[in-house]
Amino acid sequence: MQRFSLVTHRSFSHSCVKPKSACSLVKPVHHLVKIDKSKLSPRFPELKYDKSDIRSPGFKPKDTHADRLNDHYLNTLQSDLLLINYSHNAAVVKGLKQRAWSGDSPYHLNRPPKNPRGSKAQLPDIHPIKWSNIPGLESVVINCFVREARENQLLAITAALQLQQITGCKPHPIFSKNDVPTWKLRKGHQMGAKVELKGKEMSQFLSTLTEIVLPRIREYKGISNQSGNRFGGISFGLTAEDIKFFPEIDANQDSWPKTFGMHININTSAQLDYQARTLLSGFQFPFFGEEK
């Protein structure tokens, strides 16, 4: 009986045929299209509703009440502001613009234009008040800077919690940008927080401020007429003692043994400061002093 043996030899040659991987000419899109696999199954149809649908378990009601501040502006203030700021035969007042070079010298070629006369930047044009550009509220920015946070950074976290308690919105931390040895300030330290309010959150904060907080401050004169950035922005501040008059803080004074003052910047669509002051006076903000 003959026996056969199979002997295998290792081949170290690189010329042997190897299978090549296929190359598709169609670009893949499976990583670009997001597929919710939970909706492909026929099970649990009650979980497939959109979160904006009231039948969805994840539905969150948002518009639970009317915006009294916005309704007051639309029903009363808007028409009054149009009448107060009306000027017969008013024309557009041109703001300061950049100036071109005379061209007498060859060095004037490709040179950037000169700054406006008497200003480092261009100023916008002032248009007459019409039905399309009546001054209105845009946003409220609250800034809380804690000087003691350079030694104890936990105070900056407390200031952020104070803003969140008062406004109901999540604040953003503020960090120092430079090193100032004389102030013992280091770059990158959290020094406070700020929050920007729009819509109903802004209306709720302004209503609480004008109806509850400011009337409880003793000998409160109001906002200075010198306040303003010349383009419809009004700024003022509240001390640490004034913050205790907010109902969110007053109801839990034991939880807030230390409060922090804050700066409030009200941004409006007014073109001049006196137009912004007229708008805010309609929301019961008092002003005092001489104008600029």
Swiss-Prot record:
A GO cellular component entry from the record: cytosolic large ribosomal subunit
Regions annotated as coiled coil: none
Swiss-Prot/TrEMBL keywords: Mitochondrion, Ribonucleoprotein, Ribosomal protein, Transit peptide
Keyword Transport: no
The keyword Ribosomal protein is annotated on this UniProt entry: yes
Transit peptide: 1-19
Pfam hit, one: Ribosomal_L5
MF terms in GO: RNA binding; structural constituent of ribosome
Principal location class: mitochondrion
Subcellular location(s) per record: Mitochondrion
Superkingdom of source: Eukaryota
Any one GO BP annotation for this protein: translation
Task of the protein: Component of the mitochondrial ribosome (mitoribosome), a dedicated translation machinery responsible for the synthesis of mitochondrial genome-encoded proteins, including at least some of the essential transmembrane subunits of the mitochondrial respiratory chain. The mitoribosomes are attached to the mitochondrial inner membrane and translation products are cotranslationally integrated into the membrane.
Subunit structure: Component of the mitochondrial large ribosomal subunit (mt-LSU). Mature yeast 74S mitochondrial ribosomes consist of a small (37S) and a large (54S) subunit. The 37S small subunit contains a 15S ribosomal RNA (15S mt-rRNA) and 34 different proteins. The 54S large subunit contains a 21S rRNA (21S mt-rRNA) and 46 different proteins. Unlike bacterial L5, uL5m does not bind zinc.
Family in the record: Belongs to the universal ribosomal protein uL5 family.
The protein's name: Large ribosomal subunit protein uL5m
UniProt organism field: Saccharomyces cerevisiae (strain ATCC 204508 / S288c)
GN (gene name): MRPL7
